[in-house]
């Protein structure tokens, strides 16, 4: 079941705020410095109202991605594992690799999607599920590429997405 959480342990994602002092973070989050300290250590959960303020006031795109993931899990988390090279070109290469893997199976996906869902065999459903997981990999790397490159280039990812929303509305896609 998909849920928007009322609060989260934000200690992991607070690292994406950079080297901002707690006092400055408190001002950005419209809360007290001790509350920021407790959120950073995991002693206190970050509430939705503080998260909303953080999304509006903290400049780090990676922070916004990680925060959005923690509250909804409908967007991917920041790919920051030990086997991920934190370089925009590495994100681009991984995105391309995953996109090519998905693209290689596009014919199989089409054969499944042209059939009514009620007529799919068990094997076709398993194949569809696996191909959708490949698509999730592509989207995960795509989101991470967008947010990492936006931070690298000092561009607001939210603004880019908002601009695309307008473009999609004009095209009558949404």
Region roles according to the model:
Residues 112-174:
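Charged, low-complexity intrinsically disordered regulatory/assembly segments
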Residues 49-65:
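DNA major-groove recognition helix of helix-turn-helix/homeodomain DNA-binding modules
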Residues 14-15, 26, 55:
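The alpha-helix within a helix-turn-helix
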Residues 8, 19-21, 46-49:
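Residue-level signal for the short linker/turn that defines the boundary of a DNA-recognition helix
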Residues 30-45:
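Recognition helix of helix-turn-helix/homeodomain-like DNA-binding domains
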Residues 72-140:
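Helix-turn-helix/homeodomain-like alpha-helical modules used for DNA recognition
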Residues 1-17:
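A short, Lys/Arg-rich alpha-helix, primarily the initiator
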Residues 10-11, 25-26, 36-39:
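Conserved hydrophobic/aromatic packing and binding residues within compact polymer-binding modules
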């Amino acid at each position: 079941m998909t849920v928007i959480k009322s609060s989260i342990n934000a200690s992991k994602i607070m690292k994406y705020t950079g080297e901002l002092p707690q006092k400055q973070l408190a001002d950005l989050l419209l809360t007290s410095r001790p509350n920021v300290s407790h959120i950073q250590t995991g002693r206190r959960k970050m509430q939705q109202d503080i998260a909303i303020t953080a999304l509006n006031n903290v400049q780090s795109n990676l922070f916004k991605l990680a925060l959005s993931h923690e509250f909804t899990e409908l967007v991917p988390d920041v790919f920051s594992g030990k086997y991920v090279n934190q370089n925009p070109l590495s994100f681009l290469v991984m995105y391309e690799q995953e996109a090519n893997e998905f693209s290689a199976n596009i014919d199989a996906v089409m054969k499944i999607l042209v059939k009514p869902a009620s007529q799919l065999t068990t094997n076709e459903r398993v194949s569809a599920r696996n191909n959708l997981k490949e698509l999730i990999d592509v989207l995960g790397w795509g989101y991470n590429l967008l947010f990492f490159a936006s931070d690298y280039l000092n561009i607001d990812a939210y603004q880019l997405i908002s601009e695309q929303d307008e473009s999609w509305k004009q095209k009558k896609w949404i």
